């Protein structure tokens, strides 16, 4: 299967200039999981102008092609945005940092938990990562593994 994270943005570049300054640091955006951001770049007047800015291919795709037993069940992860970086987990338990502007992979950490074999539940699934920061100079991306 081919999984892609698709990021859309308005063709009005000036309107999206401040979007890079807004983080989405947790699932649901805040401790209350409101899933809301007070942004005004996309509205009823320009939503029809949205276009694909970039696509990101999950590294799980290559693993699934090399060994069909490693094919994920689905892609259910929600990325976090910290600064100009998206952090995401893949169904096979990899963690990626992605440049939010151009979709290029900055780094990838492979836990190799898929080496333990397919889980007996619904197969390979992963829902995301968590972020912690001391508010100064230390930051941690946390991900529970599939095994």
Model-derived features: positions:
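Positively charged n-region of N-terminal signal peptides that target proteins for export
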Residues: 1-5
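Aromatic (tryptophan-biased) beta-strands that constitute blades/sheets of beta-rich domains
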Residues: 20-70, 74, 104-118
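Short loop/turn segments that connect beta-strands within beta-propeller blades
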Residues: 100-102
């Amino acid at each position: 299967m081919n999984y892609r994270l698709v990021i859309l943005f308005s063709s009005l570049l000036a309107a999206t200039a401040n979007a890079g300054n807004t983080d989405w640091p947790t699932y649901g955006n805040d401790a209350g999981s409101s899933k809301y951001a007070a942004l005004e770049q996309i509205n009823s007047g320009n939503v029809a102008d949205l276009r694909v800015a970039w696509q990101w291919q999950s590294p799980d795709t290559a693993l699934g092609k090399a060994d069909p037993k490693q094919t994920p069940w689905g892609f259910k992860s929600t990325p976090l945005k910290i600064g100009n970086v998206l952090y995401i987990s893949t169904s096979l338990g990899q963690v990626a940092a992605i440049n939010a502007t151009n979709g290029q992979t900055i780094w990838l950490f492979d836990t190799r938990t898929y080496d333990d074999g397919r889980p007996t539940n619904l197969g390979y699934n992963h829902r995301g990562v968590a972020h912690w920061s001391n508010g100064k100079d230390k930051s941690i991306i946390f991900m529970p593994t599939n095994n």
